[in-house]
Amino acid sequence: MSALPLEAAGIVTDALSPALPHEPLPADVVHDGTPGTGIRELGAFRDVELGVWEMSEGAAVDTEADEVFIVLAGAARVDFIAPALPSIEVRTGSVVRLTEGMRTLWTVHETLRKVYVA
């Protein structure tokens, strides 16, 4: 899908519907199952990137970007490996702040879709 021209005010995009094609995750990051991820970049606004990201059921580690995200659908547990922080459960409506370089383990119970600002 093409990027949404965010500089054009008044444009609407549906972040829940189009299907996002998933790519399998590399074996060295997968901890359980066969999760895949898909992304749709929506563009940039004032030097900030916006997009929709999705992960299917399973568990995988990630090194995070500096971002804020809002969960649109699904459910997951996020374990913080570094820095060591308490685990969180996220679901539809959750708003989370991550910082660049955080190491996390995502255990997705129900395919998770989020809008991110990074």
Describe the predicted segments one by one.
Residues 1-51:
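A short, N-terminal "cap"/entry segment at the start of jelly-roll beta-barrel domains
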Residues 46-64, 100:
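Conserved short histidine dyad/triad with adjacent acidic residue
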Residues 63-78:
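Short, conserved beta-strand element in jelly-roll/cupin
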Residues 81-83, 109:
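Conserved catalytic-core motifs of eukaryotic protein kinase domains, centered on the activation segment
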Residues 83-101:
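Short acidic-glycine-tyrosine-enriched beta hairpin
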Residues 97, 104-105, 109-118:
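A short hydrophobic beta-strand segment most commonly corresponding to one strand
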